[in-house]
């Protein structure tokens, strides 16, 4: 319970009563209260308490004020309180009922303000079942008395007693239901009351844990409790009459579940991994292991202590590490961590509750794996004091020597990787050392060409060190040194020209045979006494030759600055110098001839063609000059007209505009349209000057008002060249040949088509209403024809041959016809096909011949034919019903048919 110093003692009793009633109705204060947050602190202890044993921890709330609070116990002979609120036993003694309850006081050192809290200590339950309490031993909780009115003011009477919380150990073995307290109202003497409890654990989940006898008010627990699930139950007790009317205000009943040490500590990880650099000093932090206990952390059951059970390996000391028993921090306690000897340590860590009490505490273990990390405590060391190598001269990017070192540090780490450098013997920087990342070897490499004639041997001083500096306190030198002897091998080198290119200045127009200069190549291998010969490699204009022995260059043609092979007045030629070494080597040199201009080109008129009108007005011709020479052998130019022929100066006049341009105009008033060649004399400014008569083709044409030639004149004036005319004629001839070939091909195709039509089966020739009677159904049933009957019979007597008369095909025959009729007028071919073909040819040759020659015999259909006689087929109508006069218009071949159908009764 807490008391506020300087409380409102001067306030009216009514205000105090109202304020206290309001606070009790709300159940809690909204503002922070200085003091103990709990009304009662409880702990479960063994029967025997040892001296110095921590019992529990009480907390004090300062409300964020910097108060200096001093604790003291109401039983100082048995208990003391530390500054952090931990309660210790002053002496060893068996815990009795008298010592199970005491008070703890907290006093502000500055204001002397004082607070107190009750402490209840409970004995651990024995393994045997607790005996049932006698009825007279059951505690009672009586409802407080109601407020009474005195003199018009409310006044609360004192309670019979303060309702303390009920402490109930977890995991109780019963028997159940186990009686706790009896709830009673002092009005049960006059009324018949009924008691009940509400809240979590009674009528709210988890329901049925606490029950009350409605008549006697006996409150009981029905099952063992588990503090790790619910540490406190808050119930409300009610008292009503038999009609259900409330008799007493509900009272709060708090049931604290007293913690039992029923949970072992559990590590957050079964295996913990940490690391520490080798060579670390004692006290170096390594890692932290953490375990948790589900029991009450404010009681001994949840207070853990750590310790190291074992260390493997145990070298160089079995106790290389220690652990803070409260925080779990692992630190080093001994020197001598060396990764090259021991790379990893394995520790077995134990966590025990009850503050590490080995007798009562529960424990658990975990593994801590500590890796010793590498530091640079071993410098690289060369495996030899001197290394040897050789390199051909003028070679670069060649590995000369391979430097090897040893390093005991962890491979492929900055403490193991070697860095090489050349500390002496290479003032010009011709060598470099690269590090092989796999083997850590140093590769001595040539980075600049070496001349054998200048340096035949190098002695290099090299050093090797790690990428990171050595760790502090290491006695070894930070680097290792060695020497490298490099021998240079002589090789045949290329001859070279100096200078290259060689530039000379000469005037153009030099005659052939003129000696220009001498190209001389140098041989770097002066100790080999080799001969050099010269050849021409590139001479675009073929103007030069070179002496193969002494390198003299002579012209073989006239040098011309205006040649297309000369660029910017410079002519380039390339020559080759070769020695007779083994193997032979060669080098190239370039000769650049800067050609000086002379006045060797006469100027020409530009443009070479122009047009003007028939009259002097309204336009004129502007001309200029083209000279391939350069100043001072070019412009300014002089323009003039020649004296002959006389018509030139009579018809034309020229006026100089400036040094580069002149103007040509008609001198006469009218010049007939046409093309005129006007010679113009142009003179340059060379010394001596050079003149030229250049022809300007001028087209004189009719002009419009704007001074432009009309289209008619342009068309008339346009001329075709001979080549163009020949090409046009060739195209016309080829076109005519193609047309002729196409006509011949068409004629030939028509003849072939006509010949094929003569052989067309009459079945395909259907004209108007001409019917075909040679088709009698789905084909002949008898396919065994006697082809000999279709041939000319030789055994028939002449008097037996009876001519066949011409008759209508749609009329029944009047008399019986012979079975095998024979054409008497037919020749005697051996096959009926030949007979038909000959008849067709005769009809084609004689257009006036009647068509009966092509009549076929249809009355023989083979032996055994089931077809009836064709004469049995009657026409559906008489011949007079139809008009067949149009058959006369079909030509001679249908004349017979026209007579048969169009001749009436005849």
From Swiss-Prot:
Annotated binding of Ca(2+) 3, by residue: 261, 263, 293, 301, 353
InterPro entries in UniProt: Cadherin, Cadherin-like_dom, Cadherin-like_sf, Cadherin_CS, Cadherin_pro_dom, Cadherin_Y-type_LIR, Catenin-bd_sf
Gene3D superfamilies: Cadherins, TCF3-CBD (Catenin binding domain)
Biological process per Gene Ontology, one example term: heterophilic cell-cell adhesion via plasma membrane cell adhesion molecules
Compartmental location: Cell membrane; Cell membrane, Sarcolemma; Cell junction; Cell surface
Posttranslational mods: Cleaved by MMP24. Ectodomain cleavage leads to the generation of a soluble 90 kDa N-terminal soluble fragment and a 45 kDa membrane-bound C-terminal fragment 1 (CTF1), which is further cleaved by gamma-secretase into a 35 kDa. Cleavage in neural stem cells by MMP24 affects CDH2-mediated anchorage of neural stem cells to ependymocytes in the adult subependymal zone, leading to modulate neural stem cell quiescence.
Residues carrying covalently attached carbohydrate according to the record: 190, 273, 325, 402, 572, 622, 651, 692
Residue numbers binding Ca(2+) 1: 170, 226, 228, 262
Record's keyword annotation contains Metal-binding: yes
A cellular component annotation (GO) from this entry: glutamatergic synapse
Binding site for Ca(2+) 2: 170, 228, 259-260, 262, 295
Example GO molecular function: protein phosphatase binding
Membrane-related topology note: Single-pass type I membrane protein
Residue ranges, compositional bias (Low complexity): 863-880
Extracellular side: 160-724
Record topological domains on the Cytoplasmic side: 746-906
Transmembrane regions listed in the UniProt entry: 725-745
Domain Cadherin stretches: 160-267, 268-382, 383-497, 498-603, 604-717
Notes on the domains: Three calcium ions are usually bound at the interface of each cadherin domain and rigidify the connections, imparting a strong curvature to the full-length ectodomain. Calcium-binding sites are occupied sequentially in the order of site 3, then site 2 and site 1.
Assembly notes: Homodimer (via extracellular region). Can also form heterodimers with other cadherins (via extracellular region). Dimerization occurs in trans, i.e. with a cadherin chain from another cell. Interacts with PCDH8; this complex may also include TAOK2. The interaction with PCDH8 may lead to internalization through TAOK2/p38 MAPK pathway. Identified in a complex containing FGFR4, NCAM1, CDH2, PLCG1, FRS2, SRC, SHC1, GAP43 and CTTN. May interact with OBSCN (via protein kinase domain 2). Interacts with FBXO45.
Name of the protein described by the UniProt record: Cadherin-2
